[in-house]
Amino acid sequence: MSASAATGVFVLSLSAIPVTYVFNHLAAQHDSWTIVGVAALILFLVALLARVLVKRKPPRDPLFYVYAVFGFTSVVNLIIGLEQDGIIDGFMTHYLREGEPYLNTAYGHMICYWDGSAHYLMYLVMVAAIAWEETYRTIGLYWVGSIIMSVVVFVPGNIVGKYGTRICPAFFLSIPYTCLPVWAGFRIYNQPSENYNYPSKVIQEAQAKDLLRRPFDLMLVVCLLLATGFCLFRGLIALDCPSELCRLYTQFQEPYLKDPAAYPKIQMLAYMFYSVPYFVTALYGLVVPGCSWMPDITLIHAGGLAQAQFSHIGASLHARTAYVYRVPEEAKILFLALNIAYGVLPQLLAYRCIYKPEFFIKTKAEEKVE
């Protein structure tokens, strides 16, 4: 493949601008099932056009076509976000009203912006890597964590929240958006991991140091313990814990956790049942040398937390959130400090695991034993 294929995918994604404008005007004249059928046909045509772009020399990685289609939908989501803010008009108005009204929520608004910016950049990078026949395993795992976290919260939130009674046929468009990332995740994970050619002496010296002689790791361990407590606490709030401390925190710090849209509740439960086990596992990996799986799971978790905290912080402060559920003015500084710190911690841990991996590399003796 050549670099022109990656450029073609970029141009193809920008075709979402005229397509959404025409689609919006046609959708206003047809029923919901017709809208879903046309939307599915458009996505199929995007995949077909991506195939035509690389007809002479098709990519070895079939995920090229997945990223091409998802890149197109990312531009659609960016258009939705801009239309919700009143920057543009007439592109997705009817679809937002009749197709997926839950995208009009503060949380829906934030994930549209995340998908239209962060995910879009990741798709372009991964398409370019495939075109140049280079590995993209690191950014791929980060993307897997990010998109799966958004699906885990957004799809159930649409069903159990206040929009549960307004589920439209367009909801079925979420099925490929749910299944394809899982399939992509397995393919990315099975790609050859990066080989670290560190001398045995360097690895042995790094792994001989206990936790007290690794101050950065010690700081990470302390932060992981605090983050675990924070996750459990907010998870209990999501489960309607009647304790006075939970009530006061919800009333004066994060009233958004009680939003009837249900996204914050599901997000806190995802933290409780996804992040807490990860934190415990990461604590083990920072203490016991040779845990070669640490960089991979850390990347996936870092991607998930980046998406989740961006959406949660934004929705908590957003004007589309009812005033009674928004973060109080006097609590904003503490709210931002806690939530930004909670979102940054996994990024620091991922940086530590990827760029200084000596402690996590298995020695040749351990590999022989296995």
UniProtKB/Swiss-Prot annotation:
Alphabetical UniProt keywords: Lysosome, Membrane, Repeat, Transmembrane, Transmembrane helix
Transmembrane intervals: 3-23, 34-54, 62-82, 110-130, 139-159, 166-186, 218-238, 268-288, 331-351
Residue stretches making up the EXPERA domain: 60-185, 216-350
Official protein name in the record: Transmembrane 6 superfamily member 1
Protein encoded by which gene: TM6SF1
Tissue specificity of this protein: Enhanced expression in spleen, testis and peripheral blood leukocytes.
Any Gene Ontology CC annotation: lysosomal membrane
Role according to the record: May function as sterol isomerase.
Source organism of this protein record: Homo sapiens (Human)
UniProt subcellular location: Lysosome membrane
Family affiliation: Belongs to the TM6SF family.
Membrane topology: Multi-pass membrane protein
This protein's record includes keyword Zinc: no
Ion transport listed as a keyword: no
Xref: InterPro entries: EXPERA (IPR033118), TM6SF1-like (IPR047195)
